[in-house]
Structures are given as structure tokens and as C-alpha cells.
């Protein structure tokens, strides 16, 4: 094995750096607690408090990392100007312009994640799988908005954007109905991916969830669900 050649090839494969590692998944669009069973508290000492601090920290981190990189942004890291605000179902590319400028200046691509947690419209721990139609519709519209934002990222950087669909939907106890939430979840993802996009430039994918705080017994988007959905929808997602 030519190890030098192997290392050189690896150096050319971009690794996507998660912006949310810089502030313990707090984000900039809300002041409430973190939800979704994620294993953080939002209280890490020394975390970035503003977009400027987060970007400066990312610059420092990237200066210490070898190889090609991309920036991975969560929807809750929208940057609003002059007191403006858009809820997650109304997010637009302009709310992420500073991230686009940051990436373009460094010759990097952007990946994206809808944020299906830490929001007052997470009802009974559910979003895309909620039996409440109003709740489910809100989160479907959020997913569609994120497809449009991902398209903008790809257009602006000239680099394909991977859009990762992950939710914390689930229950602390084993539910009587384990099929219903997954049927609704599938229908919701189908509807999100009905939003037009160029599959060469926008690469949707579905990520599974194992378990989390308060979601110990049942997760809707299990590994089996995510793998099966991706296998059955190869033309639409990774």
C-alpha cells in the first residue's frame, strides 16, 4: 500500500465540520431549552455566544485540521438582521447569507440540516410523525424550506450540498402503536422531498436515531427505518 498516496487522496475528500459543536447546539433562533433527546445541555463553558464568535472559533479549529473541509449548518443557526425573525417554516436563503459569505471566502462548500427539535411546536416529542396535522404540516414546511436553502447553498458555492433529515421523534415508553408514527414519518419525508431540486447539487439523506434522553424505548426514525427508506428511494436521497 502506498500510504503517501492514500493520505494524499484522503486529504482531498472534504470533511463537513458541524457548526453546532461550537456552542453546544444552542443556535441563534430561540432562547428555550434543548429538546429532542440530544445528549447536550447547551451550557458548555466557553461556548460561542454570537455568530461572530462561532465563526472565529471555526476558523481557529480549521486552521488546526488537515485536509479539505466543508461547513455543516443547522437551520437553527439562521442569522437575523435588525430585529427581523422568521419561524422555521418560513426560513429563506437570505437568513443564511452570512454563512454563504463565510464559506465562499474560504473556498468551501456548505451542508445543511433542518432543525426538528428545540422548538415550541415539537408536540409530545413528535414533529414529522405527529398525529396532530397542524404540527406535522409546520415541520413539513420547514423541511421544504430547507430544500430551497440547500439549493441556494449549492448555487452560490458551486459545490453540492448534503441535506440531512434527522428528528428526535420518539417515546420514553414502548407505545401500543409502533406502525402509525412511522407511516406518518414516511409520508412527511415524501412530501418534503417533493420540493423540486437538482439531485446532482442537492443530496438529501435520512439519518437514524438510536435513543436519547426521554426517548429511551422507541424512536420513529430507527436505523431499520432510515436504511429501508433510503434503499427504496435511491433516486431521491442518499
Per-segment meaning from a language model:
Residues 141-142:
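Active-site-proximal beta-alpha core segment in soluble small-molecule metabolic enzymes
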Residues 1-131, 138, 148, 155, ...:
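Alpha/beta catalytic barrel-like cores
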Residues 75, 167, 206-210:
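A general secondary-structure junction signal
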Residues 114-116, 169-171, 210:
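Short, flexible active-site-adjacent loop segments at beta-strand->alpha-helix junctions, enriched
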Residues 172-238:
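Acidic/histidine-rich catalytic cores of soluble enzymes
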Residues 147-177, 202-205:
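Active-site groove signature of glycoside hydrolases
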Residues 135-136, 175:
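Generic detector of solvent-exposed, compositionally biased contiguous segments
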Amino acid at each position: 500500500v502506498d500510504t503517501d498516496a492514500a493520505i494524499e487522496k484522503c486529504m482531498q475528500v472534504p470533511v463537513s465540520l458541524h457548526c453546532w459543536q461550537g456552542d453546544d447546539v444552542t443556535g441563534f433562533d430561540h432562547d428555550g431549552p434543548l429538546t429532542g433527546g440530544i445528549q447536550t445541555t447547551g451550557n458548555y463553558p466557553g461556548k460561542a455566544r454570537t455568530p461572530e464568535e462561532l465563526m472565529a472559533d471555526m476558523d481557529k479549529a480549521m486552521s488546526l485540521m488537515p485536509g479539505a473541509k466543508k461547513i455543516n449548518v443547522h437551520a437553527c443557526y439562521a442569522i437575523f438582521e435588525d430585529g427581523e425573525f422568521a419561524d422555521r417554516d418560513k426560513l429563506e436563503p437570505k437568513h443564511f447569507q452570512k454563512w454563504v459569505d463565510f464559506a465562499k471566502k474560504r473556498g468551501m462548500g456548505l451542508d445543511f440540516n433542518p432543525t426538528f427539535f428545540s422548538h415550541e411546536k415539537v408536540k409530545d416529542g413528535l414533529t414529522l410523525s405527529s398525529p396532530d396535522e397542524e404540527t406535522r404540516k409546520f415541520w413539513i414546511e420547514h423541511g421544504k424550506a430547507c430544500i430551497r436553502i440547500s439549493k441556494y447553498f449549492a448555487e452560490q458555492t458551486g459545490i453540492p450540498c448534503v441535506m440531512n433529515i434527522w428528528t428526535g421523534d420518539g417515546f420514553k415508553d414502548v407505545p401500543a402503536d409502533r406502525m402509525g408514527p412511522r407511516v406518518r414519518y414516511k409520508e412527511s419525508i415524501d412530501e418534503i422531498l417533493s420540493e423540486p431540486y437538482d439531485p446532482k447539487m442537492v443530496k438529501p439523506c435520512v439519518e437514524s436515531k438510536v435513543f436519547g434522553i426521554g426517548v429511551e424505548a422507541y424512536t420513529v426514525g430507527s436505523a431499520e427505518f432510515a436504511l429501508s427508506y433510503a434503499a427504496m428511494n435511491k433516486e431521491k436521497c442518499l
